[in-house]
């Protein structure tokens, strides 16, 4: 009877295990042996227009530990360990921690918790992060050292690291990624979602001995990020950065920015900011070094703004290059007085002469012919007071007075004070005025391909006519007189046009004018404008006039840019510029 009762009890327990609790035990077992980890995509590559790599992903791995495997040093839990295996397993955490410290840095104690970590329920974990972005060659050394000691439980998965082969080249445009590989500045930030791609996931059945052959596996592949080709030309960018860096150093300016643009398309060929930084060492950069001054800084442009003023006046038929104007020594404005930077008596100037001599008085008198609402509309049509849509983070809008501006404000903005712009806004506006009158929104992205290699649509340049071709020709005539005024302003072999700018700067600490912004915009060739260069130096200490400190920099850049982009030397001489007239 006793034997029958015992057999009955065992049969009941077997029934409970097999029929009633079997699903729960199976699920628990599956959970214990299922291993899963993320698959990291390659971040999209960024290159210049000619294929020079500016940002890329290099092979690296994410190193992780399997504490359960380490606790048995790879011996399958279904196998009983002998004395030697038990002794080896007991030594594994310490030995593996020493190997990790040797190749990853730190002390063995830094890794002990990683190789022995437990889940909330107290059981040993199957996954413990050790280090991200470990160079592949470093992991190879770790793997070989572990194999030599017959230690198990350290694994790795693809985890590419971001590199910037060109260092500081275009770093204020490209930006950088943070320690987690997330874009934190420049295009790396604004295009982070597209560049990042999509993580994948792999799961498989594993024992403490490792992956179970023919076990249940699932794989969702990672999708690599989108590759971007920029409009930038790395060679031109280097020329511009070197020229700008020298100018900022020589003048002891607080900062500087320079742009080279194709006036017929709006493509940015170079965009430099100084001081700058190395994208691969962003952690040691200062705030001033990381700012893209060409996009993020708004400033009063000074006399370069006269190009925009004359374009509006010429388009309305209020002036031509040969219009006559009597320019007195000074004029009253808003309870104050407007004077020119040079002392003079009464002058009889053409409009061409007003621009060549950069007369604030002459510009103000001519601007008073136009009503304020019309002037405000033209400035808006030229893109001032609005972001350009270039796609770079932190773009400033600047500030432009509206139709209700005071008379004194109208007078000021005519010659570039009382409003603020960014360098990219001003460059795009001047490009529109000299190219025949069509505004092309500036672009920095040329093309893109997704992780599958398929072409992806990118925002193109939006175009609109802002002045007539006739008005454009009149303004080019005026701007050529600026260059021919002095023999050392020309670019050897080319007829070019340009405009100097010297503006007082507002000091926020006192809300008063203190210091200067010196600038020059140059375009070539005069006969068929193609390439624009705009240089701005903020608060230079040694010299402050645009003609003295910014013009030579633009001249140096243009002497390289014009032949580089296939612009043939000029075969004609500039026409005689009539600047003054006899009454």
Feature names for model-found ranges:
Residues 33, 38-42, 199, 252-256, ...:
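Short, small/polar residue-rich loop motifs at catalytic or cofactor-binding pockets
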Residues 69, 91, 95-224, 535:
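Small/polar-residue-rich segments within soluble enzyme cores
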Residues 55, 206-217, 262-303, 308-539, ...:
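Beta-lactam-recognizing serine transpeptidase/beta-lactamase-like catalytic domain environment
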Residues 1-24:
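Hydrophobic alpha-helical transmembrane signal-anchor segments
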Residues 32-36, 66-70, 76-90, 97-101, ...:
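Second-shell loop/turn segments in exported
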Residues 212-256:
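Conserved, well-ordered alpha-helix/loop/beta-strand core segments that scaffold catalytic motifs
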Residues 34-59:
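Short extracytoplasmic
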């Amino acid at each position: 009877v006793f034997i029958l009762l015992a057999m009955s009890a065992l049969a009941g327990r077997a029934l409970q295990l097999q029929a009633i609790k079997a699903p729960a035990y199976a699920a628990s077992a599956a959970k214990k042996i299922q291993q899963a980890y993320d698959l990291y995509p390659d971040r999209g590559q960024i290159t210049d227009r000619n294929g020079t790599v500016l940002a890329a992903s290099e092979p690296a791995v994410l190193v992780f530990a399997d504490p359960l495997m380490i606790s048995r040093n790879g011996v399958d839990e279904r196998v009983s360990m002998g004395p030697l295996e038990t002794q080896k397993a007991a030594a594994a955490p310490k030995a593996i921690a020493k190997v990790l410290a040797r190749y990853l840095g730190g002390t063995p104690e830094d890794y002990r918790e990683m190789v022995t970590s437990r889940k909330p329920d107290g059981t040993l974990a199957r996954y413990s992060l050790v280090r991200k972005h470990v160079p592949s060659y470093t992991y190879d050394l770790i793997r070989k050292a572990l194999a030599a000691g017959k230690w198990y439980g350290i694994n790795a998965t693809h985890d590419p690291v971001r590199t910037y082969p060109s260092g500081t080249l275009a770093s204020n445009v490209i930006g950088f990624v943070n320690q987690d590989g997330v874009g934190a500045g420049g295009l790396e930030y604004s295009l982070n979602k597209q560049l990042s791609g999509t993580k994948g996931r792999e799961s498989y059945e594993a024992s403490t001995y490792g992956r179970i052959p023919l076990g249940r596996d699932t794989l969702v592949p990672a999708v690599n990020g989108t590759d971007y080709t920029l409009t930038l030309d790395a060679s031109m960018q280097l020329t511009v950065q070197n020229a700008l860096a020298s100018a900022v150093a020589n003048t002891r300016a607080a900062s500087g920015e320079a742009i080279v643009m194709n006036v017929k398309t709006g493509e940015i060929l170079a965009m430099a900011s100084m001081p700058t930084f190395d994208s691969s060492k962003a952690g040691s950069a200062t705030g001033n070094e990381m700012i893209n001054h060409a996009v993020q800084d708004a400033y009063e442009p000074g006399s370069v703004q006269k190009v925009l003023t004359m374009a509006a006046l010429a388009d309305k038929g209020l002036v031509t290059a040969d219009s006559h104007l009597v320019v007195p020594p000074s004029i009253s404005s808003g309870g104050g007085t407007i004077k020119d930077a040079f002392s003079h008596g009464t002058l009889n100037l053409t409009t061409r002469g007003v621009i060549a001599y950069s007369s604030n008085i002459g510009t103000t008198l001519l601007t008073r012919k136009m009503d304020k609402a019309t002037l405000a509309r033209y400035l808006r049509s030229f893109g001032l007071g609005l972001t350009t849509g270039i796609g770079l983070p932190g773009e400033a809008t600047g500030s432009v007075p509206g139709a209700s501006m005071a008379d004194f404000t109208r007078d000021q903005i005519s010659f570039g004070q009382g409003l603020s712009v960014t360098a990219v806004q001003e460059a795009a506006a001047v490009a529109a005025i000299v190219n025949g009158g069509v505004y092309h929104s500036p672009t920095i992205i040329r093309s893109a391909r997704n992780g599958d290699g398929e072409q992806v649509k990118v925002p193109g340049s939006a175009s609109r006519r802002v002045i007539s071709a006739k008005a454009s020709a009149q303004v080019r005539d005026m701007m050529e007189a600026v260059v021919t005024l002095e023999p050392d302003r020309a670019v050897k072999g080319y007829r070019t046009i340009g405009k100097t700018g010297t503006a007082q700067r507002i000091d926020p600490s006192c809300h008063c004018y203190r210091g200067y912004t010196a600038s020059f915009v140059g375009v070539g060739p005069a006969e068929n404008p193609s390439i624009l260069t705009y240089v701005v130096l903020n608060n230079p200490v040694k010299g402050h006039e645009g003609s003295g400190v910014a013009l030579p920099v633009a001249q140096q850049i243009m002497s390289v840019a014009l032949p580089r982009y296939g612009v043939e030397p000029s075969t004609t001489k500039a026409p005689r510029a009539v600047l003054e007239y006899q009454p």
